[in-house]
Amino acid sequence: MELGNGKLPRTGLNSLNQAVHPTWGLAWTDGNRVVLTDLQLHSGEAKFGDSRVIGRFESVCGVCWAPVRTVRSPALLAIQHRKLVSVWQLCPSTAGASKWQASQTSEVRESLPILPRGCVWHPKDAVLTVLTAQGVSIFPNVHQDGSRVKVDVNTKGRVYCACWTLDGQRLVVAIDSNLHSYIWDSSQKSLHSCSFCPVFPVNCSIRSIEATGNSQVAIATELPLHKLCSLNASEALDGPPNGDDGSVHTRPVDEQVATMDMNSGVTVSPFSVPLDLTHIHFNPSQAEQSSLICLRKKDYLTGTGQDSSHLILVTFKKAITITKKVAIPGILVPDLIAFNLTAELVAVASNTCNVILIYSAAPSSMPNIQQIQLESNERPKGICFLTDRLLLIAVGKQKPSEAAFLPSSEYGQYTVRLIVREMAQGSESSGTSAESQGAYSDFTALLSKADREKFTDSLSPGSSPLSQGLLLTPNSSTQSGRSGRALIQEIKSPLSPLSSDSVVHETLHRPPWLCPALPRPSRTPEHTSTPELNSPQRENLQKEKETCPLSRELEILSRHLVAMQQYLSELTGFLHKEKRVAPAYPPSQDAPYVHLIYQNPCSVGPTERRAVLLCDGKLRLSTVQQMFGLHLVEMLHEVLSSIPSNHMVTHNLHGPGGLFWSV
């Protein structure tokens, strides 16, 4: 569905966040108008209906619906302007069923510009949260009065985004690289900091956040470019195990969280000493030199696994905070995120990249299960899940003239349209379902167990499983033996064919066709409260986890290998067709150029003298013809009686306009 041209923010925007209402449909803006479009689902397909303009304004940055309280209660729509938020009430008109009326109920003004995602509704009540770069305010009764609850941020950092947990009891605010957690008292209409974890450091700038549970949020962090040049050499690099191997060996630390004093909240960064990389020489192994296509283990040159942006699940418990991290390949600033509770899917995208990645938010693993590719000149300006199968995407397309130059403002002109993409059949969070198993049974039957083990060993020889999560306990100072420092325990997973984080390598080190991350099975960590299975069930579960994802990986890998083989054959053909000329450097006694002198007997003026370079000791007559503007050039073959002492040779050439010779 085409929405037309609009003026939208270039970054940090999710125009479809809280934009769908079950009764009133989809609310959207083109920068000046606020439009409602009917949206209905029939047989698993989205159908767009008529559109109605409810208002025209000087500037509109975004719109979002308040949660549905009761069927007959009026719907509240927050319209975000630059420094103003107006709340409108929509209800059916008494004149007729097809009539409706909209009226403004309240208005919120801020001294600073409101963030692109600066309006966040409470999931259960008509409580509006307004974000600026330096503050957060809560309006408990925004549709009745303008009473404000100021959030005590207690820091000078920049606010990027915020969200409520699904139960509405916790507000999580992302400030720079920290998560600030607050508890909401709905009866007293007050907010206070979390007692056990008021500030949780992530060590990377947080660009987007979305609630995934009653006590869990998903955050997306950007690529920390400023930290790649300030890694600690002692923590990043390990020496070679023997003298024969000169390649770089690094410690497989995939996830690292800055140590935190739970009492004082002071963050101690381990990145202080600069790393000198000038002495490092990379020597490929013999297997890599002989193989046509070589799949290597992840390059741990950056030491801490911070060579890409990350998707992190943070769970707030009463006495524990758990994080799970997975890399986001190819997206530097992931400022778009959406979540579907039924399918446990997380969609991650960026306003500056044409790729949308779908991850499974299952407790045991977070594999990248699908990638949506837009056109090269298209950018996602909003994403949201309509159902567990359908993802609604607002696609913005810039003019070629605007895309060719650096942006001069925070806003740009886009041609916006809506598209719906269906999730893949294998996108269920349960990797052991019967449907997933049957979908790849034919392919798996072709592989014996020995072949699968051999293929797995060839992909990652000697590799150990990477961390799937971090366990941070408040009473860890007594366990670690260090006062004031928290214990960071790596949660190991069983051996698997491919690690989700090791396969998801940065696109700077990989060809584009190998960018999608391959799914990997994983087992629930031991610290979780999962009921213990008996031995036969555990064996069957392990077999299913080994077979289904491995067949999926092999199928994707086979397609990539076929495509790579085609590219290599085309490249070989180009090399054979190319005519290679290895010109020999002329001897010092031979001049690589000649002097051409042209004399016209009909003209009284001076002769023309030009120096012309020779190509392999030859000069084309057509070049001479074009140089002097002749219609015809004829070469006379003569027998030279003698050669001058200076080894110069004279050739007489006759043309229709006179005589010229080369010396």
UniProtKB/Swiss-Prot annotation:
Biased composition (Low complexity): 458-472
Modified residues (Phosphothreonine): 524
Modified residue annotations for N-acetylmethionine: 1
PROSITE patterns: WD_REPEATS_1 (PS00678)
Pfam families attached to this UniProt entry: WDCP (PF15390)
Post-translational modification: Phosphorylated on Tyr when associated with HCK.
Modified residues (Phosphoserine): 291, 460, 493
Coiled coil: 549-577
Keywords, comma-separated and alphabetical: Acetylation, Coiled coil, Phosphoprotein, Repeat, WD repeat
PANTHER family registered for this protein in UniProt: WD REPEAT AND COILED-COIL-CONTAINING PROTEIN
Subunit composition and interactions: Oligomer. Interacts with HCK (via SH3 domain).
Descriptive protein name: WD repeat and coiled-coil-containing protein
Source organism of this protein record: Mus musculus
